[in-house]
Amino acid sequence: MTEKVTKFQSPVPIVLKLRDLIFGKEKPDLFTKINFLLNLVLWAIFMIWSLFSFYTLEARNFIYRQKGIPVETIIKNRGRELGFEGEDFLQRLLTVNGISIICWGVVFLSLVLMYRRSKRFYYLFLVPIVFYIGLLFIYVSPSYFFEDTTTFDKLALIIMLTSASIYYYLIKNKEKDEEINFFGIETDEDGA
């Protein structure tokens, strides 16, 4: 005979309760789901890349011993090309990647608020992304931002900021019980 699995023996109820705790029990509309999923995928790419970059920089000696890849030499050479001296470029990359992990963690919290259709998501979303871009541009260097940051990264950041701004605009107007009108022109349907 098979034993019946109780809720205390199965991990599924715990996972479902955790999901409900994080995302809430109410399902959002289709536009919110699409916007959330788009930003979640882009968030995951940036978070994974930041984690890998940080690990690679921290484990550069281990990588050299195991694989013979001179990560530190490669980074120092690129730093010299960008005008940095000695360990400065490496330390700045470590700092940027460490802080970017924190920034992307805050962005995930904002995505949870987006899924719950809270207007507060926008500020938690906007501040760390703008801070991240500022770190790359100001703390490392403008030439690093333009030459070493990929076009994909730049486009992904623009897509994230644009989609979040549009979504914020739409939920702000929805809370005011106004019709969504991007151009601000009243039409016959709007009561003109």
Give the role of each language-model region:
Residues 2-192:
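Topology signature of small-to-medium multi-pass alpha-helical membrane proteins
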